[in-house]
Amino acid sequence: MAMKAVCVLKGDGPVQGTINFEQKESNGPVKVWGSITGLAEGLHGFHVHQFGDNTQGCTSAGPHFNPLSRKHGGPEDEERHVGDLGNVTAGKDGVAKVSIEDSVISLSGDHSIIGRTLVVHEKADDLGKGGNEESKKTGNAGGRLACGVIGIAQ
């Protein structure tokens, strides 16, 4: 049975969006789609963070969701956090159209992202290839522009 989830992204500034998730089989890939507006043109890190806690804005969401205790990487890398979804790309109009399929995140089980926070970052994610310690943790993606808790959808 297909599972669906949704996340409404909001922040302190103009960045906002809605991201949808669908997983047709419990061990199958998750389709991720939607749009984010109010971004500066270019690449922005896009990650699922550990906690569904937004009591102190996006900072209380904690680090990237990483149940396997791995180093940060890109979505195509073997060595990555479960929550590492790479980058979204905003055009001149400040809109990022998101269309991703990921086989590491899940909407159920040990890698479930339900109840965790999705974050869009200020800068590009270097996918763990930046050559410093921060790159291996966060991809040097910078501040958290907007976030929201991922919830079950109809």
UniProtKB/Swiss-Prot annotation:
Disulphide bridges, residue numbers: C58-C147
Domain of life of the native organism: Eukaryota
EC number, as in UniProt: 1.15.1.1
Pfam families in the record: Sod_Cu
Residues with lipid group (S-palmitoyl cysteine): C7
Reaction equation(s) it catalyzes: 2 superoxide + 2 H(+) = H2O2 + O2
Record-listed N6-succinyllysine modification sites: K4, K10, K92, K123, K137
Residues carrying N6-acetyllysine: K123, K137
Location in the cell: Cytoplasm; Nucleus
Co-factor binding details: Binds 1 copper ion per subunit.
Post-translational modification (record): Palmitoylation helps nuclear targeting and decreases catalytic activity.
Positions of the UniProt region annotated as Disordered: 62-81
Binding-site list for Zn(2+): H64, H72, H81, D84
GO process terms (BP): auditory receptor cell stereocilium organization; embryo implantation; glutathione metabolic process; heart contraction; hydrogen peroxide biosynthetic process; intracellular iron ion homeostasis; locomotory behavior; muscle cell cellular homeostasis
PTM sites of type N-acetylalanine: A2
This protein's UniProt keywords: Acetylation, Antioxidant, Copper, Cytoplasm, Disulfide bond, Lipoprotein, Metal-binding, Nucleus, Oxidoreductase, Palmitate, Phosphoprotein, Zinc
Modification Phosphoserine occurs at: S99, S103, S106, S108
Cofactor(s) the protein needs: Cu cation; Zn(2+)
GO molecular function: copper ion binding; protein phosphatase 2B binding; protein-folding chaperone binding; superoxide dismutase activity; zinc ion binding
Record-linked InterPro entries: SOD-like_Cu/Zn_dom_sf, SOD_Cu/Zn_/chaperone, SOD_Cu/Zn_BS, SOD_Cu_Zn_dom
Family: Belongs to the Cu-Zn superoxide dismutase family.
Quaternary context: Homodimer; non-disulfide-linked. Heterodimer with SOD1. The heterodimer CCS:SOD1 interacts with SLC31A1; this heterotrimer is Cu(1+)-mediated and its maintenance is regulated through SOD1 activation.
Function text: Destroys radicals which are normally produced within the cells and which are toxic to biological systems.
Protein name per Swiss-Prot or TrEMBL: Superoxide dismutase [Cu-Zn]
Species for this entry: Callithrix jacchus (White-tufted-ear marmoset)
